[in-house]
Amino acid sequence: MRLLIFLGLLWSLVATLLGSKWPEPVFGRLVSPGFPEKYADHQDRSWTLTAPPGYRLRLYFTHFDLELSYRCEYDFVKLSSGTKVLATLCGQESTDTEQAPGNDTFYSLGPSLKVTFHSDYSNEKPFTGFEAFYAAEDVDECRVSLGDSVPCDHYCHNYLGGYYCSCRAGYVLHQNKHTCSALCSGQVFTGRSGYLSSPEYPQPYPKLSSCTYSIRLEDGFSVILDFVESFDVETHPEAQCPYDSLKIQTDKGEHGPFCGKTLPPRIETDSHKVTITFATDESGNHTGWKIHYTSTARPCPDPTAPPNGSISPVQAIYVLKDRFSVFCKTGFELLQGSVPLKSFTAVCQKDGSWDRPMPECSIIDCGPPDDLPNGHVDYITGPEVTTYKAVIQYSCEETFYTMSSNGKYVCEADGFWTSSKGEKLPPVCEPVCGLSTHTIGGRIVGGQPAKPGDFPWQVLLLGQTTAAAGALIHDNWVLTAAHAVYEKRMAASSLNIRMGILKRLSPHYTQAWPEEIFIHEGYTHGAGFDNDIALIKLKNKVTINGSIMPVCLPRKEAASLMRTDFTGTVAGWGLTQKGLLARNLMFVDIPIADHQKCTAVYEKLYPGVRVSANMLCAGLETGGKDSCRGDSGGALVFLDNETQRWFVGGIVSWGSINCGAADQYGVYTKVINYIPWIENIISNF
């Protein structure tokens, strides 16, 4: 199907080129008079054969028998096309001076062929004459012999009865239908330098072309033209460039025309606009020209880099539109006056001045370091020195605060004080936890008064009609029992928090106010004491000192320090053996009780009450040592022998109504089970 479509299109093209009607066939047979018998004397016959335009005639002989004579003077067949004789034939075979057709084929030079037969007055022998056949055939005008001129500049396309020409990209067929003229007008060059040349340079340039080249630079530049390599433009010895010519036009005047074989001299145009025209005629075979154009402008002063800086690029001369940038050494910053710059680039103007003044490279100044709460900063490099590579040392208030890093910071090139780990924020002085002057031995119910420094984490929680306790675990977080603050969870500000006291009613204390109370989501008020744990976030951080200090949270290894019969300490202002709230902070050292035994005791005392795995029991089978009402939320603490710090292992939760009774233990929330919950609340709030 595709082939049929193609053939249809081809037929349409040929029909368009030749007209709507295909030429009638031209062919036939020619014979001598009387053939195949002998021809008579005194015979003169001629045939004029004609083919359609674009065709030629082909003729060959199948029989040829004529009288042989010197130069075929007697009998002959003459073939001629136009004014040219193609051949004069006689005899049967060719000799040195005579030609017989043999197997040769003869072609007309155009669409016409004349065949002439002549016999003289006598023949010594009977000759039978000739038989010839002819036909018209298409002429391939695109096929040329060596030395003949080509019909087309670029591409020649033959068809039946004629041909047509086409051109390569960048050329257009001239109206003469043979010459390809270059499309070389409207070329614009805007670079400060470059090359331009005649089409096809260094090959011969095309004929009948008119080229225009425009150089357009910014005002302030001046174009310089240099002819390079070779110059070959058709000329005439008696006239100035009458055939092909090159002209150069500026707003200051015209240069040229140029032709011949001598390179024209340099042309300093003193203009930023140049137009070059190149015109060619239909003759000649010349290679053309090539121009290297450059530009110049009024130079700007050589820039000098500021101290501690450099410029780029470095050039021998800077002219219009040239630019340079300034870069400072590491530790220095660009300043224009007092204004910091992210970057700096200056551009040369047409009047020979830079568009911006040179900046400075000023040493980076990180400024005074941030104050360190509960600590201080020392200048190591020198008093108040805060510039690049200066060193400062942060330190925490000894004994009560510590930091995880070494506290050394350096002023870096980005303008920030930076630690050896790349930290930009100052260190944090974290409170030291678990320091106490307490030694094991004493009791609450059956206990004794605490001394200053024994339980610096102890917190007194006062409601309008209630009192409870808590333990400071950070400078703004208090750990307590959920049941002790449950009623205050929606009105945290009504809770009165006091620290740094031993006497419950002492007027000398540190006041703290809650910001928010967090009850464990697994705690259900009035339905047992599982998950009896809560956190109180303080509005402000408290200052850590000998009277106020957090207790540590248990390490992973702490479970081994809270086994049965291991001793812990609990302190509080709860009921004493006399049934009154203690005026002084009391404490007692009590052992951990066996969990199964404790569970069995409370199943017997209070059927349905469960001692869960989130609880631990403490006390003596014989009684006498226990926490009691008013101690709720206080910390049951243990000494970590490895760190020599006290940690909270339990929170006073619940127990028998009869505090300190035999076989009735105090029950505490097991803190180690809630470390992930505690850390999550503190880190997110």
UniProtKB/Swiss-Prot annotation:
Record's GO cellular component terms: extracellular region
Signal peptide annotation: 1-19
InterPro entries in the record: CUB_dom, EGF-like_Ca-bd_dom, EGF-like_dom, EGF_Ca-bd_CS, NOTCH1_EGF-like, Pept_S1A_C1r/C1S/mannan-bd, Peptidase_S1_PA, Peptidase_S1_PA_chymotrypsin
This protein's record includes keyword Signal: yes
Residues reported to bind Ca(2+) 1: E67, D75, D120, S122, N123
Gene3D superfamilies hit by this protein: Complement Module, domain 1, Laminin, Spermadhesin, CUB domain, Trypsin-like serine proteases
Annotated keywords: Autocatalytic cleavage, Calcium, Complement pathway, Disulfide bond, EGF-like domain, Glycoprotein, Hydrolase, Hydroxylation, Immunity, Innate immunity, Metal-binding, Protease, Repeat, Secreted, Serine protease, Signal, Sushi
GO molecular function: calcium ion binding; calcium-dependent protein binding; complement component C4b binding; serine-type endopeptidase activity
Record-annotated site: Cleavage: R443, I444
Calcium is among the record's keywords: yes
Pfam families xref list: CUB, EGF_CA, Sushi, Trypsin
All copies of domain EGF-like, residue ranges: 138-181
Annotated tissue distribution: Plasma.
Covalent S-S links between cysteines: C72-C90, C142-C156, C152-C165, C167-C180, C184-C211, C241-C259, C300-C348, C328-C361, C366-C411, C396-C429, C433-C552, C598-C617, C628-C659
Peptidase S1 domain segment(s): 444-683
Extra facts: Dimerization and MBL2 binding requires calcium ions.
Subunit structure: Homodimer; disulfide-linked. Binds MBL2. Isoform 2 binds to MASP1. Binds SERPING1.
Biological role stated in the UniProt entry: Serum protease that plays an important role in the activation of the complement system via mannose-binding lectin. After activation by auto-catalytic cleavage it cleaves C2 and C4, leading to their activation and to the formation of C3 convertase.
Name listed for the protein in its UniProt record: Mannan-binding lectin serine protease 2
Gene: Masp2
